[in-house]
Curated annotation (Swiss-Prot):
Annotated transit peptide: 1-46
Organism: Arabidopsis thaliana
Keywords: Chloroplast, Membrane, Photosynthesis, Photosystem I, Photosystem II, Plastid, Thylakoid, Transit peptide, Transmembrane, Transmembrane helix
Protein name: Early light-induced protein 1, chloroplastic
Pfam family membership, one: Chloroa_b-bind
Record's function text: Prevents excess accumulation of free chlorophyll by inhibiting the entire chlorophyll biosynthesis pathway (e.g. 5-aminolevulinate synthesis and Mg-protoporphyrin IX chelatase activity), and hence prevent photooxidative stress. Probably involved in the integration of pigments into the mature light-harvesting pigment-protein complexes. Light-harvesting chlorophyll (LHC) a/b-binding protein required to ensure a high rate of chlorophyll accumulation during deetiolation in continuous high light. Involved in seed germination. May fulfill a photoprotective functions.
Domain of life: Eukaryota
Alphabetical list of InterPro entries matching this protein: Chloroa_b-bind
Transmembrane regions listed in the UniProt entry: 104-124, 131-151, 175-195
Bilayer disposition of the protein: Multi-pass membrane protein
Family note: Belongs to the ELIP/psbS family.
GO cellular component: chloroplast thylakoid membrane; photosystem I; photosystem II
Compositionally biased intervals (Pro residues): 69-79
Disordered as annotated region, ranges: 46-81
């Protein structure tokens, strides 16, 4: 017990600078070509309006050191151009599918609850009583209304200000999708309307 304690104390007592760990013996740079250093080529720099001859040497300055003029700030980075191709907009990772489905779910959830409160019908009864035509019409209108700005190159993030941001719309749409499925499932299990 005492020797184990002494060994542990000797490991922790020595500073990190006293122990050398040589990783070059474990891994040589030749066996890993990506670890070799690439030494950069020398680069010359000239001030604007300065001498252009290579032979000219700067004149010794007799006055105090003057501050160098500030270089102009770099231009802001260019925003990537938004693709307006139909296949890019409706791609799985594109800007349209989740937003369109979320908008449809928000409208559908509110409409399902409104009809349930007014007529007392559950979601499955609403669909069988002519809800399919309402669903198809709403889907066509909201899809076209969502795609028109995207075809013009307007991104969703550019129009989000205040509390109505694009992230809030995404999350509201996700919750509405879950809510609509949960409403239909609950009414199916319960056998009647939720409210």
């Amino acid at each position: 017990m005492a020797t184990a304690s002494f060994n542990m104390q000797s490991v922790f007592a020595g500073g990190l600078t006293t122990r050398k760990i040589n990783t070059n013996k474990l891994f040589s740079a030749g066996s890993f070509p990506n670890l070799k250093r690439n030494y950069p080529v020398g680069v010359r720099c000239m001030a604007e309006g300065g001498p252009t001859n290579e032979d000219s040497s700067p004149a010794p300055s007799t006055s105090a050191a003057q501050p160098l003029p500030k270089s102009p700030s770099p231009p802001p980075p260019m925003k990537p151009k938004v693709s307006t191709k139909f296949s890019d907009l409706l791609a799985f990772s594109g800007p349209a599918p989740e937003r369109i489905n979320g908008r449809l779910a928000m409208v559908g959830f509110v409409a399902a609850l409104a009809v349930e409160l007014s007529k007392g019908e559950n979601v499955l009864a609403q669909i069988s009583d002519g809800g399919v035509s309402w669903f198809l019409g709403t889907t066509a209108i909201l899809t076209l209304a969502s795609l028109v700005p995207l075809f013009k190159g307007i991104s969703v993030e550019s129009k989000s200000k205040g509390i109505m941001t694009s992230d809030a719309e995404l999350w509201n749409g996700r919750f509405a999708m879950l809510g609509l499925v949960a409403l239909a499932f609950t009414e199916f299990v319960k056998g009647g309307t939720l409210v």
